[in-house]
Amino acid sequence: MIRSNGGPSRGRLVWCGLVATAALASEAALAEDHALAARAGLLGLGVEYAHSLGDRWAVRVGWNGSELGFEAEESGIDYDLDLVWDSLAVGVDFHPTGGALRLSAGLLRNDNRVEARGELNDTVTIGGTTYDSDAVGSLFGRVTFDNSAVFAGIGWDWSRRRTRGVGVSLDIGVLSQGSPRVSLRASGPIADVPEFEDDLAAEEAEFEDEIKDLDLLPFATIGVVFRF
C-alpha cells in the first residue's frame, strides 16, 4: 500500500478551491447588494437606500423633503404659498430582464402639503358673501392629503450591472394620495361668527372641487446612484 507522507490530498485541494471560489463570489454579490442614491423630481429632493434580492428583485427605502414658495390668486385673494414635500417611501422593484428596467410599487407615508397666507385689501367675497377685509383679517389655508399613499411606476437603474461605482436612475409613475382636503381660517374679529364659518366652509368645498384631480399625482425623478 502506498501512503502519502505529507501534503494535502486532491479532495482537500478541490474543497479548498470551492470554498475560496464561493467566498469570492459571495464578496462580489455583496458588492452589488447595496446602493445609495440622491434624487430630484416632482416629489422634491430626496435620498434613498436600495438592497438587491437576487437578479430580478430589490427593495428601496427613501425620503423626500424640500420646500418651494410661490404666489397664486384664488377667488380674488392673493396668496403666498409654500409647497412642502415630506414623505417616506418603501417600495419593491421587479427587473423583468434582470437589467436596468424595473417595475416598481410601494407605500408612502405622506405629509406633502400646501400652506397659504392671504392678505386682503378693501373687501373680499367668501362663500358668496362680501366682507370687509378689516373684519376678516388675514386668511390662512392648508391643503393636505391622506397620510398613507400608494405608488406605481416604471424606471431604469443603469447602475445595476456595476459591481460598485456611480450610475444614473430614472423613474416615472403615479402617486395615489386620496382627495385633497382644504382648511381655511381667518385672524379677524368675525372668525368665530357662525355665518362667516359657514361661508368659509363653502369656500373650502369650492377649492377642494377645483383641485380634486390631485388625488392622482404623476411624478418623475432622476437620481445619481452609488453602488457598493
What residue spans do the PLM features occupy?
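Transmembrane beta-strands of outer-membrane beta-barrel pores
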Residues: 42-44, 63-69, 107-113, 158, ...
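Extracellular/periplasm-exposed beta-strand and loop segments of Gram-negative cell-envelope proteins
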Residues: 63-88, 112-149, 178-217
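Outer-membrane beta-barrel strand-turn architecture
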Residues: 51-55, 96-98, 158-162, 228
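N-terminal signal peptide c-region/cleavage motif recognized by signal peptidases
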Residues: 26-27
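A membrane-pore/channel beta-structure motif
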Residues: 31-33, 40-42, 52, 66-67, ...
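Transmembrane beta-strands of outer-membrane beta-barrel proteins
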Residues: 34-38, 47, 55, 59-61, ...
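N-terminal secretory signal peptides that target proteins for export/translocation
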Residues: 1-11
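Outer-membrane beta-barrel "beta-signal"
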Residues: 93, 215-228
